[in-house]
């Protein structure tokens, strides 16, 4: 059985990790063993924060909608309840965009929600 030398594959693997560690400071971007740990941790953070981003954006949308509805004398929960009863199915992202970019249109939505209550 011939001897298998893995120089090419290990070199490619090292190169891939060091390329991913580009931009890190100190030995974190040049020493393979340390760079491997930092890249792995970075991927863990990225995975975690992709989940957290969804939560944070939803919280932001709710805060924006709440602020806009309070200008019209209504709370967020009353507004959402009114929208559901009126049969208006807009998600929070669209509602927050409407509240910022088109306050008049948002005002009509608030009036419809009030009428449905």
UniProtKB/Swiss-Prot annotation:
Belongs to the bacterial ribosomal protein bL20 family. Binds directly to 23S ribosomal RNA and is necessary for the in vitro assembly process of the 50S ribosomal subunit. It is not involved in the protein synthesizing functions of that subunit. One of its GO terms (cellular component) is ribosome. It comes from Magnetococcus marinus (strain ATCC BAA-1437 / JCM 17883 / MC-1). The keyword rRNA-binding applies. This is Large ribosomal subunit protein bL20. The lineage of its organism: Bacteria, Pseudomonadati, Pseudomonadota, Alphaproteobacteria, Magnetococcales. It comes from the Bacteria. The keyword Ribonucleoprotein applies. The gene is rplT. One of its GO terms (molecular function) is structural constituent of ribosome. Keywords: Ribonucleoprotein, Ribosomal protein, RNA-binding, rRNA-binding. PROSITE patterns: RIBOSOMAL_L20. One of its GO terms (biological process) is ribosomal large subunit assembly.
């Amino acid at each position: 059985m011939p001897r298998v030398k893995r120089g090419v594959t290990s070199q490619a693997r090292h190169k891939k990790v060091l390329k991913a560690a580009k931009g890190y400071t100190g030995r974190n971007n040049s020493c393979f063993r340390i760079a491997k740990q930092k890249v792995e941790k970075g991927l863990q953070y990225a995975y975690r924060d992709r989940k957290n981003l969804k939560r944070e954006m939803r919280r932001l949308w709710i805060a924006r909608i709440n602020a806009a509805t309070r200008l019209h004398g209504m709370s967020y929960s009353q507004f959402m309840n009114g929208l559901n009863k009126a049969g208006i199915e807009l998600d929070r992202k669209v509602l927050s965009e409407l509240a910022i970019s088109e306050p008049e249109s948002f005002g009509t939505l608030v009036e419809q929600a009030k009428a449905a209550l």
